[in-house]
């Protein structure tokens, strides 16, 4: 009755008389107990008071509203009672069914059924008859006013495959307890708990007393099936089987439940598991780092797995020529390190000892010497240019003498007009980017000092003069290209089961994307950088030293470290037979370290070249992903946080060029690791568009209230969508009302994108479920090029539908190249549809929280509930008005 509060002095009198009338009428019984009832004589009561007619009318209206609310509450209460009764009846039905199945199984196996009769002494005097759920529900709801169709079924954010109940035969209720159970909530719950406890005690006593009979039945070949059924009966809660993980065919017919993982909250289930992992991590302190899960009690998989052995992972640090030369088929898990650029001095040595026959093709000659990228023109060879700074004087003399062979002279007769455009491009690369031609791995940075310049100053002057003769002006503004980062070695990261169909995150993801880019001709238009492994020092900018050693070198390198300091206490045996750090993320000591270091190192190299101005932008086709990895926690297929490590390296290496870095994360999952890495850094802006479902979607973080801490408050901007399927219209609304205004206010010097494509259409609900088009990712990429002088680098994160992610990546690279207007061209539906109500509520919350940190968000509420086409028209009209006003001011 809060609406009766007023400044009028007559209101307390009315309230007191209403309370007296309410107490005189009493309270209703049953469902109406405890709920006050408005007296029916309210009109007469109001007439006795000295109130004005208008106030009386207001009070009558309020009384009618109160009665309506009262009836609504009563209706909700009755429906809630019905739902609770149905739920309790279903629990009772499940418990009785399990008990009957256990009894029938033991009778068929020859076990004394008296062991179970102790647990069911309260239920029936003999074998329990099968219980029909439909009949029980009918009896339960027969006395209520509601019906079954009014019951609401709670929806879950993931698609679950519930085991179907076996068909039951109808039977007459032979026990009075069956109808008495649902009388009250407390009786039902306590009795059900008692039955479960008795069932557990009986199972334990049965295992102790019948160990001898179990041994005999194992000899007869019946022990495996009995243990499987017993494990099913003991498990009260089992993880449902989800589509991305298939059960082995040998076990698919035996049961339809999946093994309960150590952490029941998995990425493929789209459930938050960070708190559960931290709790389990604390409980398992002091355990051995290599410990196998016993399969006898808590596993439904009966296959065996070989013992975890130390592999020859040290080969990743050996030179290529020291590695065994056997075939890859004999060594399936041997991973070769990614080669850097060819050693130019070694190339000239091979060049010096080469006996070039007369008439050999010049292209093949240069290919042998590994010099074709910068010495493929007869005009350059005729000049007899010396390669200063590359070899000693003897090598240069040998090269000069070899350049005067008749084979080169015959090739020099070719017309120079055929090479004019190629000459310009190569001279441009030599003069403006000569320092990038010799790159060494971070482990050999000490040797890089001898390669500071590929050409001496005198040779550069000769090259410049030659360029001027060919019509190329080196003072003109160069046209930079888009960089691509890719190495096929990253695809070798796989589970030891060697069956990619068991894992949604596999090497085929980057292979399909690279094939798509090659087919569309984008690889030929871009510059592919050399993949490099990240150094341990670079990885330790985000991750701890022990964590880096564990996952970048080998777990065996941490045997002497205190067990409490290890990032992982034990490995898990996955349902596929492989080894994992959790039920989602597999680990292979022969391939994981190399792939993880290559992924981080490739992104660092690509971003460094963009920051230095040698590339205009870039796309890193890398795996494994990284935005879930925290400082000491591998999670969600991620080992090292590639984007976070790269941002730290850019801050340290280029403090002026990359003073402010913006990280845009459009993966459908929140990048918990990236946000934590810069939670208190005001120089790094982290913005994420992701599915949240009020914390019920993996990893459960990224709510609208997570805004950073300390000096970084306001620099973590989360757009967590909940409820409903998001499409282009919802992402466009978020982009124009939140992302672009904040980016414009932040004025970043460099932009990194966690480009996960699992929000693209084609993904199952458990892995995303949104319906974003590939063109939308191209549109967002094109918009980002308007900031930070176009210094934008995309890093592949998630995305598991191969067709969707390859199409989305192709749109992004096409937008980065900038030669086609088709990149990011949205369809009519995307431009003319309004965002749904769930997205509107989310964006309103984000603007309300962050407009105190970003004044540009003020007034953006009006732009939420509009279509993209309407917003563009309004924006165009405003721009035209501003231009007219500017022209008028200039004329005056």
From Swiss-Prot:
Q: Does the keyword Amino-acid biosynthesis apply?
A: no
Where are the annotated segments for Histone deacetylase?
481-822
Q: What main location does UniProt list?
A: nucleus
Show the InterPro entries listed in the entry.
HDAC_PDAC (IPR050284), His_deacetylse (IPR000286), His_deacetylse_dom (IPR023801), His_deacetylse_dom_sf (IPR037138), Ureohydrolase_dom_sf (IPR023696)
Show the Gene3D superfamilies listed in the entry: Histone deacetylase domain
- Any Pfam family from its record, for instance, is Hist_deacetyl
Q: Where is the composition biased (Polar residues)?
A: 171-192, 208-222
Amino-acid biosynthesis listed as a keyword: no
Catalyses: N(6)-acetyl-L-lysyl-[histone] + H2O = L-lysyl-[histone] + acetate
Cite the active-site annotation.
Answer: 628
For this protein, the Enzyme Commission number is: 3.5.1.98
Q: Name one GO cellular component term.
A: histone deacetylase complex
- Location in the cell: Nucleus
GO biological process, alphabetically ordered: epigenetic regulation of gene expression
Q: Which UniProt keywords apply?
A: Chromatin regulator, Hydrolase, Nucleus, Repressor, Transcription, Transcription regulation
User: Region (Disordered) spans which residues?
Assistant: 145-225
Q: Name one GO molecular function term.
A: histone deacetylase activity
The record's function comment reads: Responsible for the deacetylation of lysine residues on the N-terminal part of the core histones (H2A, H2B, H3 and H4). Histone deacetylation gives a tag for epigenetic repression and plays an important role in transcriptional regulation, cell cycle progression and developmental events. Histone deacetylases act via the formation of large multiprotein complexes.
Similarity field: Belongs to the histone deacetylase family. HD type 2 subfamily.
Know the name of this protein? Histone deacetylase 4
Q: What is the source species?
A: Caenorhabditis briggsae
Upper classification of the source organism reads: Eukaryota, Metazoa, Ecdysozoa, Nematoda, Chromadorea
